[in-house]
UniProtKB/Swiss-Prot annotation:
GO function term, MF aspect, one: structural constituent of ribosome
HAMAP family: Ribosomal_bL27 (MF_00539)
Region (Disordered): 1-20
Pfam family, one: Ribosomal_L27
Alphabetically ordered keywords of this record: Ribonucleoprotein, Ribosomal protein, RNA-binding, rRNA-binding, tRNA-binding
UniProt name for this protein: Large ribosomal subunit protein bL27
InterPro entries (UniProt xref): Ribosomal_bL27, Ribosomal_bL27_CS
GO cellular component: cytoplasm; cytosolic large ribosomal subunit
Subunit structure and binding partners: Part of the 50S ribosomal subunit. Cross-links to the 23S rRNA. Cross-links to the A and P site tRNAs.
PANTHER family named among the record's database cross-references: LARGE RIBOSOMAL SUBUNIT PROTEIN BL27M (PTHR15893:SF0), RIBOSOMAL PROTEIN L27 (PTHR15893)
Family (UniProt): Belongs to the bacterial ribosomal protein bL27 family.
GO biological process: assembly of large subunit precursor of preribosome; cytoplasmic translation; cytosolic ribosome assembly; positive regulation of ribosome biogenesis; regulation of cell growth; ribosomal large subunit assembly
Amino acid sequence: MAHKKAGGSTRNGRDSEAKRLGVKRFGGESVLAGSIIVRQRGTKFHAGANVGCGRDHTLFAKADGKVKFEVKGPKNRKFISIEAE
């Protein structure tokens, strides 16, 4: 009789769902007000002109225009702003 003894249990075998973070609209792209530009954890990118910051640090356009990425300030922070077309 070909029998296989039962395998033991394991405490592994789980993984969380991907959160789909990252830049959604790149520099030079046209956006409409309300469009999500970046989904992020913390402030890797900061909100510049015509850009709002949600409570989960999502950056979104407050006006229609083109996305502009810039590095400024003494700490070389990355800012995202919207230039009106």
